[in-house]
């Protein structure tokens, strides 16, 4: 069969872009050759509906072992009693959690998308805001941080069945123990979505949700540095609070409802090549080298936030505890969209992002979100953060000057072109 030169030329073009540029999108990272090898393996040919030992297809002896390894490694990595490695994405993991815990119309309490939450935490354009009744908490206008007393007030008033502790653009650690107190006070299930800080949490560098939250979900890329996919965890299994029973009349455990919500409730055949890649990534994350990486990632984020503050940029909440920061650009007289477009021309990729109490649309925004996961994988350290912030500042203060932008692009290429994609 003739090689598809059009597609493979574009893949090479994208590889060149990744090698020569600065990747600062907080949700992106680079995987190891071994993770890519597993994701591109013959396992993509295998259908395996069901779970290990309970498949609807023959010939699953090998993939059963692979999936069980992925499950066992995920449980070891996070100290969990239960893991489901089949969700194709974080959004589908969250969908399964909702289906297992809720009925249509039930009230959910989540982090407002415009303050740093995620689409699947109740946004009206998402299934979570259409099938359920969403109410929201946000950050304090002065501090840019969560106000747990205010969250308690909202929970007491609205009586949600599910409380979501998680974010896509919040740079501070979360107090899961306080969230659990709030959830218990109203009889709600506490569900943590740790898709962004999962790698830091797994290595003990941020608060651990597993002892406090009934259910935890995460993506397997971002700071976990695995393939794109989802994962559901529980520290301990428990009887489902809805009182649903088996055909024999026994109360179903939540693990059973979660498994059923993933398959057949939400998905058909699992992606065995991606599950194998997840297993490889979990194995990498269990090693000491990953702890070194996670610590450096956090140090880089702090150094970058400090450098931005010194140059007069407004970091929401004043800094960061994790791998990212949300920058309000209103005092710089540039929109998030303008900043993103100018930086992309300079081969620096960030994403425009709404900031709390934003007065611009989601297509324009007043801010950008910046993260250090990918550049840390490439071997950059604290001293490089000042250089990067200086380059960003140069672009943003000259965002209509094509000559300056081209000059910065050359500096970026010089900084990055000789660095490996995967340094750890």
From Swiss-Prot:
A GO term from the CC aspect: cytosol
Location(s) in or outside the cell: Cytoplasm
Keyword terms: Amino-acid biosynthesis, Cytoplasm, One-carbon metabolism, Pyridoxal phosphate, Transferase
Pathway: One-carbon metabolism; tetrahydrofolate interconversion; Amino-acid biosynthesis; glycine biosynthesis; glycine from L-serine: step 1/1
Coiled coil: none
Assigned EC number: 2.1.2.1
Binding residues for (6S)-5,6,7,8-tetrahydrofolate: 113, 117-119, 361-363
Cofactor(s) required for function per UniProt: pyridoxal 5'-phosphate
Top-tier EC class: transferase
GO biological process: glycine biosynthetic process from serine; tetrahydrofolate interconversion
Record has Ion transport as a keyword: no
InterPro entries: PyrdxlP-dep_Trfase, PyrdxlP-dep_Trfase_major, PyrdxlP-dep_Trfase_small, Ser_HO-MeTrfase, Ser_HO-MeTrfase-like, Ser_HO-MeTrfase_PLP_BS, SHMT-like_dom
GO molecular function ontology, one term from the record: pyridoxal phosphate binding
Catalytic activity: (6R)-5,10-methylene-5,6,7,8-tetrahydrofolate + glycine + H2O = (6S)-5,6,7,8-tetrahydrofolate + L-serine
Pfam family, one: SHMT
Superkingdom as given in the UniProt entry: Bacteria
NCBIfam families assigned: PRK00011.1
Task of the protein: Catalyzes the reversible interconversion of serine and glycine with tetrahydrofolate (THF) serving as the one-carbon carrier. This reaction serves as the major source of one-carbon groups required for the biosynthesis of purines, thymidylate, methionine, and other important biomolecules. Also exhibits THF-independent aldolase activity toward beta-hydroxyamino acids, producing glycine and aldehydes, via a retro-aldol mechanism.
Quaternary structure and interacting proteins, as annotated: Homodimer.
Protein name according to UniProt: Serine hydroxymethyltransferase
Source species of the chain: Flavobacterium johnsoniae (strain ATCC 17061 / DSM 2064 / JCM 8514 / BCRC 14874 / CCUG 350202 / NBRC 14942 / NCIMB 11054 / UW101)
The gene coding this protein: glyA
